[in-house]
Design a protein with these regions (language model features):
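Acidic, glycine-rich active-site loops and adjacent beta-strand->loop/helix elements
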Residues: 22, 90-95, 122-127, 150-155, ...
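Phosphate/pyrophosphate-binding loops at sites that engage ATP/ADP/AMP, CoA/4′-phosphopantetheine
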Residues: 69-85, 239-256, 304, 308-309
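Buried hydrophobic positions in well-ordered alpha/beta secondary-structure cores of metabolic enzymes
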Residues: 16-18, 44, 73, 84-87, ...
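Catalytic phosphate/nucleotide-handling subdomain of diverse soluble enzymes
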Residues: 299-319, 327-334
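Flexible, glycine-rich active-site loops centered on histidine and acidic residues
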Residues: 139-172
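Conserved catalytic cysteine-centered active-site region
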Residues: 45-64, 92-146, 273-300
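Condensing-enzyme catalytic core mediating Claisen C-C bond formation in acyl metabolism
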Residues: 2-58, 162-231, 235, 239, ...
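Short acidic capping loops at alpha-helix termini that bridge into adjacent secondary structure
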Residues: 42, 80-86, 113-116, 144-145, ...
Length: 334
């Protein structure tokens, strides 16, 4: 699903011109969870790297979090709703079965009538999938400016009696504003340099929710075969990274930051080690966000830009893997 070329010729790039994020006010620590299930802080942090996560307040919707994140991104980008040609939301926890969260966001923002808006359901890979779609649309000349949002209310599909899964997940939102820009067709360009997405539907039952509209008419709860997910995730994310690096003609030692989907510290660390990227170049936010699925990458990205870690000109390698199985990678220069 990519049309990138290695030839050095002028081309249209997709630049990230603004980032935003939002975390609900309520924080759930490992000590809090130890009062709910048979676990403790040491057990959770040692195995996952997670110490706390945020959860939505009563009545706080997925679209509410998305609004906070996209408004921050728009402000940082210096754009208004009138500038947007597209709104895309990656989520597995929408407000309603239909319409999409993206449509709801468009209406609340006051985006001009007729502007396309849609959701993407690729679980933890959702943001990478969304950016791939948007990058293709920008390079084909169909749009110029877009809002891309990753947002999840995973607390709504978490079984709080299952200690194997309830320790992992959190709620939150991240957003980016992207805009078409002219590039020279080299790896020194600013913007998306390469993308690649994948899926393997034979892995369906290793990570899924027990509910669904046609199956049970309920949201259900997340169920996961942790050993299989870990084994698959590390290899898949490395595969995606190597693919986008090869597309762009860049070696891993030129990467300034590895920003993986924040699943757990073991997966994050293993991917970094296999790619031979030093620990100090690996961005980790899972310790205070937990696994926020489609929100994790844009959330970590926005936080890292805000705190000054990611700077202008930095080359950022972004892999993800999620239910489906789905996986993919982005290579972006800021």
């Amino acid at each position: 699903m990519n049309f990138h070329r290695k030839l050095a010729m002028k081309c249209t790039r997709t630049e990230i011109i603004g980032c935003g994020h939002y975390l609900p006010a309520k924080v759930l620590t490992n000590d809090d969870l130890s009062k709910m299930v048979d676990t403790n802080d040491e057990w959770i942090s040692t195995r996952t790297g997670i110490r706390s996560r945020h959860v939505v307040a009563e009545g706080e919707l997925t679209s509410d979090m998305a609004m906070h994140a996209v408004e921050m991104a728009m402000q940082n980008a210096g754009v208004t709703a009138a500038d947007l040609d597209l709104v895309v939301v990656a989520t597995l926890t929408p407000d309603n079965t239909t319409p999409s969260v993206a449509a709801r966001i468009s209406g609340r923002l006051g985006v001009k009538v007729g502007t396309p808006a849609f959701d993407i359901g690729a679980a933890c890979s959702g943001f990478v999938y969304a950016m791939t779609m948007v990058d293709n649309m920008i390079r084909l000349g169909q749009i110029k400016t877009a809002a891309v949002i990753g947002v999840e209310s995973l607390s709504k599909v978490t079984d709080w009696t299952d200690r194997n899964t309830c320790v992992l997940f959190g709620d939150g939102a991240g957003a980016v504003i992207v805009r078409a820009a002219e590039g020279e067709g080299t790896a020194n360009d600013t913007g998306v340099l390469a993308t690649k997405v994948y899926a393997d539907g034979t892995q369906y039952e290793n990570l899924y929710t027990t509910g669904g509209i046609s199956a049970t008419q309920t949201p259900g709860y997340i169920r996961m075969n942790g050993k299989e997910v870990f084994k698959f995730a590390v290899g898949a994310m490395c595969e995606a990274c190597n693919n986008v690096l090869e597309q762009a003609g860049v070696s891993a030692d030129k990467v300034d930051w590895l920003l993986p989907h924040q699943a757990n510290i073991r997966i994050i660390s293993s991917v970094g080690q296999k790619l031979d990227i030093p620990t100090e170049k690996v961005i980790v936010t899972v310790d205070h966000h937990g696994n926020t699925s489609a929100a994790s990458i844009p959330l970590a990205l926005s936080e890292s830009v805000e705190n000054g870690r990611i700077k202008k000109g930095d080359l950022v390698l972004i892999p993800a893997m999620g239910a489906g199985f789905t996986w993919g990678g982005l290579l972006v220069r800021f």
